[in-house]
């Protein structure tokens, strides 16, 4: 399969720069995986699509204000994007500068350039930085960092993004990108789902900046997925197994929940799923056999991205690309702050031949 098989034309004006005023007020395109039938509605329709006893699995990661601006102590502007917090004083980060800092180089960060950090080591594309500050890293970032909006939201971050670019249930700081399907759930909608008898469970996957990296190979089989840390605790495993046993469906909220659950299944050979606390590089594309999830709630993804490949593996390649082209015609809003899809699994998807239109 070629990366170019997963392209589609997207007018720039359909890229959402700001979210809807009301979280659950976005549009919802429902795609029936087996038939490819499509339905247009609003996100709160999700209540009618789920049954009592179904299980929604959310990602409870919380986005950290991971972007810092400043300069090298030797001169020259620098931009730091924290990829992973290692401990109270150290991080792994992407560093943009006219000349990459060498080990031992000092950085002066923050709007007032009063936060001191030292480049300790380089690990491929990432820099290990140590902060010389009495505060821990998360406190520093919360005080001085900027929200790391995706590159296609081509505007500076604003104070409002600190809450708007978070799910209402986020509780585990560590992500540099939001699990955006969850942005559409507000508390009244969650209450309605609970009142209906829909069950809920929470995994953690700290989304890294690699989620925005383009696929730089022609054949998708040659792509090496970025690594992200995921946790699927015992209570999630129990909830999934109980849901399956009673004949209900597991619905993943977002591709990060998909990757967490499927990683936990892939790592365990004795049962459907087992607890998982590890880095994952799972890459899901057409031909993949889904083991856990029955339905998926997700936003509209970038052309040629690993995420549209994941959706194609779930709903079927042709059904997915047809739905995306229809969404463009219907003027849906795309990407992180955009509209959503509800997709049921197409059991024939893994046998489908990918032939671009």
UniProtKB/Swiss-Prot annotation:
Name of this chain's protein: S-adenosylmethionine:tRNA ribosyltransferase-isomerase
Zinc-finger keyword on record: no
Organism of derivation: Edwardsiella ictaluri (strain 93-146)
Keywords in alphabetical order: Cytoplasm, Queuosine biosynthesis, S-adenosyl-L-methionine, Transferase
Enzyme Commission number(s) from the entry: 2.4.99.17
Family: Belongs to the QueA family.
A biological process term (GO) from this entry: tRNA wobble guanine modification
Its biological purpose: Transfers and isomerizes the ribose moiety from AdoMet to the 7-aminomethyl group of 7-deazaguanine (preQ1-tRNA) to give epoxyqueuosine (oQ-tRNA).
Any GO MF annotation of the entry: S-adenosylmethionine:tRNA ribosyltransferase-isomerase activity
Subcellular location: Cytoplasm
Principal location class: cytoplasm
Gene Ontology cellular-component terms listed: cytoplasm
Transferase as UniProt keyword: yes
Root EC class: transferase
């Amino acid at each position: 399969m070629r990366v170019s098989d997963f392209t589609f034309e997207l007018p720039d004006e359909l890229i959402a720069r700001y979210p809807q005023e009301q979280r659950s007020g976005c549009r919802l395109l429902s795609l029936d995986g087996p038939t490819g039938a499509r339905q247009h509605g609003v996100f709160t329709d999700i209540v009618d699509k789920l049954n009592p006893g179904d299980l929604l699995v959310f990602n409870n990661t919380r986005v950290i204000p991971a972007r810092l601006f400043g300069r090298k102590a030797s001169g020259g502007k620098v931009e730091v994007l924290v990829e992973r917090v290692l401990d109270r004083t150290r991080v792994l980060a992407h560093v943009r500068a006219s000349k990459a800092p060498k080990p031992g180089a000092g950085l002066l960060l923050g709007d007032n350039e009063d936060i001191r950090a030292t480049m300790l080591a380089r690990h491929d594309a990432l820099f290990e930085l140590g902060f010389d500050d009495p505060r821990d890293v998360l406190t520093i970032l919360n005080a001085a960092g900027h929200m790391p909006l995706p590159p296609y939201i081509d505007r500076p971050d604003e104070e409002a993004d600190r809450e708007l670019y978070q799910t209402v249930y986020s509780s585990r700081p560590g992500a540099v990108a939001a699990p955006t399907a969850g942005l559409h759930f507000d508390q009244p909608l969650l209450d309605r789902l609970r009142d209906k008898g829909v069950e809920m469970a929470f995994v953690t996957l700290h989304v890294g900046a690699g989620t925005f990296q383009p696929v730089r190979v022609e054949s998708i089989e040659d792509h090496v997925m970025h690594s992200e840390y995921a946790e699927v605790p015992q209570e999630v495993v129990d909830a999934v197994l109980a849901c399956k046993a009673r004949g209900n469906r597991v619905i993943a909220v977002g591709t990060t929940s998909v990757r967490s659950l499927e990683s936990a299944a892939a790592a365990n050979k004795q049962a459907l799923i087992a607890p998982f606390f590890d880095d994952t590089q799972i890459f899901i594309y057409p031909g993949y056999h889904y083991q856990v999830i029955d339905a998926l709630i997700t936003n509209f993804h970038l052309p040629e991205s690993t995420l549209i490949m994941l959706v194609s593996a779930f709903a079927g390649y042709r059904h997915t690309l047809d739905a995306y082209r229809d969404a463009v015609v219907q003027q849906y809003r795309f990407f992180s702050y955009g509209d959503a899809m509800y997709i049921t699994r197409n059991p024939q998807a893994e046998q489908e031949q990918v032939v671009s239109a």
